[in-house]
Amino acid sequence: RCHEASTADNAASKMYAYDAGKAALEDFCRSRGWKVQISHSLHLGFYRITYMPDILAVRQDVGIVGGRILDRHNKITSGIYDEEGNRLYKGLHKEYSGGSTHRATLMQDCAAVDIRCMRLCEKMRPVFEEITGVPYIETGKMKLADVSGISCDEAGYGKLSMELGRAAREMGFLVVWDSRMTIKIN
């Protein structure tokens, strides 16, 4: 019982609803005083918020922002952790959205992000040094935390990541995962 204008057959036939959702997000962000750009994601009904100049400058409630780490096969190896320290989306190809809710592609609050792909607000930087034993220095185009002075295995990186996430939340900050922040390791 589908016809050409049916939303069951053609999701684009209700673009007015998706545009209204986008406008609602723009209004919400404007009411918070956040300078942002809202865009449709690849999946209609899901949106991308781009903070101007970046999330740490705009959102005073965010202490850490981090992204995904891909292996040589473009599969997620790490990036986002749940409360138990499990790495979410591990093994997913970078192009896979994570199912019907597309969580693997959406910015979201989380327990922790991987220390190898993170940025911190000013107030979290001394905590980084306290936990890791190395000073917080931003490096590269994405200005990620330089972890070259930290020598540990995968489990060690996970432990440090969880400690930083816990410390941020104890200080009242959010930890945000953004899949657009991506690095590749071999």
Where are these regions (language model features)?
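C-terminal catalytic/acceptor-binding lobe
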Residues: 1-55, 103-108, 129-186
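Structured loops at beta-to-helix junctions and adjacent beta-edge loops in soluble globular domains
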Residues: 3, 68, 121-123
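Feature marks short, surface-exposed loop/turn motifs that line or immediately flank catalytic pockets
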Residues: 6, 71-73, 126
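Conserved donor NDP-sugar-binding/catalytic core segment of glycosyltransferases
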Residues: 53-87, 174, 181
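Short, well-ordered loop/turn elements at secondary-structure boundaries
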Residues: 59-61, 113-114, 170-171
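Extended hydrophobic-aromatic, low-complexity segments
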Residues: 62-65, 74-79, 108-110, 117, ...
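Glycine-centered structural positions embedded in regular secondary structure
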Residues: 78-81, 95-99, 165
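A recurrent flexible, glycine/aromatic-enriched loop bordering the glycosyltransferase active site
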Residues: 85-124, 134-140
